[in-house]
Every structure is written in structure tokens, then in C-alpha cells.
Amino acid sequence: MFKQSVFIKSAANKSGWIEDNIPEVCFVGRSNVGKSSFINTLANNKKLAKVANTPGKTRLLNFFDINNSSFRLVDAPGYGYAKISNSMKVEFGIMMEDYLTTRENLKLVCMLVDLRHKPTNDDVQMYDFLKANDIPVLMIGTKLDKLKRNEIAKNEKLIKETLEFDQNDVFVKVSNLDKINIKESYDALIRLLEVENG
């Protein structure tokens, strides 16, 4: 769990990015995957990443200082929400591609997928994009508590097959509600970021 976490700023484009050498981990996932809840659980702060009432509402990159500048967490807008305009989807695509391909601070992407469902085309495209650009990925399967015991392995297999998951990447199944594997996901994040733990 994060020892310290504080919101710094939001940015719509490169001009708003923070200029320093602090490593960043970017959290991505489709709308309603449980990204804000996962961030809040890691931070042990229910209000850190505001859980938007309307999926796809936040169209900015939100920057958070973690563990007294040990690293930064960058919360990206949820993707795949049908009710936003095509122009907003294009803006989102440009913003994300710019950040993911040119941001030197970016050391890791934490991609969240819903364990209950087969990955969407948006999920597949995001994972393919990350792999094509050699961006390290930590995959988090959310909503573990919503699955029956006999569904867990089957659903994980379906997700990995659909994404053509790289076995060198780490996959952690979590429940924000029951706090299952939160420490394991944090430990994996710290290990992959190669930063000091606190």
C-alpha cells in the first residue's frame, strides 16, 4: 500500500505534464473496470481518485505524487465509453498516444481488465499498442469477488487468450471490496517500477 499519496494536477496535453525525472506508472482500463477504486484501495484513501458518477467523464491525465516523490501515479481516462462523441474519442486517442509514446518518465503501465468479461476490442488494441511500443505492463484483473470459485481460472484463461497475453508480463487478480491481492499487486508494481519501497 502507498505510504503517502497526494493529487498534484490534471493535464489535457503535453504542456501540462510535469518536467522532472520522477518515474511514472500510468493506470489504464475501460470505463467501469474499477480503476479509481483500485487506486483508492492502494492508497487507503477512498477519495484520492474521485470515482466519477458518469463513466468516461474524466478526459484528463491526473497526476499523483506517491511515497514522497518515490514515483508518480498517472490516472488515465477510462476508454470504451459509448456515449462520448467521436471528436472526444479522437482527442483521447491523441492524448494517450502522445503520453504513452513520448513520455520519458513513463516506466510502467498498469492495465486493468474486468475478470467477469471477455476483453473488448478496446482492451485488445490497448494491450497490442503497449506491447508494440515495448512498454512494460502489469495486468490487474478486477472484481474477483464477483466470480464464483469455479469461474476464476476459466475467465483468466479466456482473458489471456483473447489478449494473446505475454507470459513475461505479470497478471494479478484483485478484489477492491475484499482487499484480496492488493499487497501482491503493490509489490509487483514496485518491483516492475524498480523504485524504493517508500
From Swiss-Prot:
Gene3D superfamilies: P-loop containing nucleotide triphosphate hydrolases. One of its GO terms (cellular component) is cytosol. Disulfide bonds: none annotated. Residues 21-195 form the EngB-type G domain. Mg(2+) binds at S36, T58. One of its GO terms (molecular function) is metal ion binding. InterPro entries: G_ENGB_dom, GTP-bd, GTP-bd_ribosome_bio_YsxC, P-loop_NTPase, Small_GTP-bd. GTP binds at residues 29-36, 56-60, 75-78, 142-145, 174-176. It holds the Pfam family MMR_HSR1. SUPFAM superfamilies: P-loop containing nucleoside triphosphate hydrolases. Belongs to the TRAFAC class TrmE-Era-EngA-EngB-Septin-like GTPase superfamily. EngB GTPase family. NCBIfam families: GTPase_YsxC (TIGR03598), small_GTP (TIGR00231). Necessary for normal cell division and for the maintenance of normal septation. PANTHER family: ENGB-TYPE G DOMAIN-CONTAINING PROTEIN, MSS1/TRME-RELATED GTP-BINDING PROTEIN. This is Probable GTP-binding protein EngB.
